[in-house]
Amino acid sequence: MQLIKILNTPSSMRNNTQRIYERLSRGEFLSVDSTNSTVRHLYEDIEENMDDYADYFKEIGLRLESGNGYFYLSRTVENKQAIESKLESFSKWLDYLDFLKCYNQSFTAGYQFRKSNLIEQISLDIELKEKARHLFKKYGVGSNLEIVNKLLQEMGNMGFAECISEQDETYKVTSAFCYAEELVNMIQIANEDEVPE
């Protein structure tokens, strides 16, 4: 039965399944607006074969999720340790998002910025400097350059931002960044809906 299912899948899907799994299983996102042609190709293949990929990943205990211009994987069943790890990771992204929105309220999908401008702004804005110091305190990251490098590395690893010009170190925020924004909005809505005792 499984062999028949594999033989009936489109050839592009058979060719891309492993590459998609390798990226998404590490917690990365695939964005429609990626500057990386491989990422865009994988995104388009999922979009064209969404039901087939969803069925395939469901068979191995994963759920293919989509947002506004991005795809990611989640587990259908998670143990307590995995949930705690996700909460810790999400807590970290709350701080990142707070910092980035303090830097510029327009910081969202499509936004472009230079690394040097971000470093300079940290030096000029006291509130931003305090938030920056808090971001990676436990890792011993100290200078503004180290903080920004670590943040850009984290954003790049998740697929939330990509370097579009190595010459002047310009970065572009991808559609996948909306995932973090949507999670924060859900928490804010949930907090507003809570009835005080």
Model region roles, listed by residue range:
Residues 58-66, 156-166:
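A short, conserved structural fragment
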Residues 85, 176-197:
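Short, amphipathic alpha-helical interaction segments positioned at domain boundaries
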Residues 152, 164-167, 174-179:
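Intrinsically disordered, low-complexity, charge-dense segments enriched in Lys/Arg
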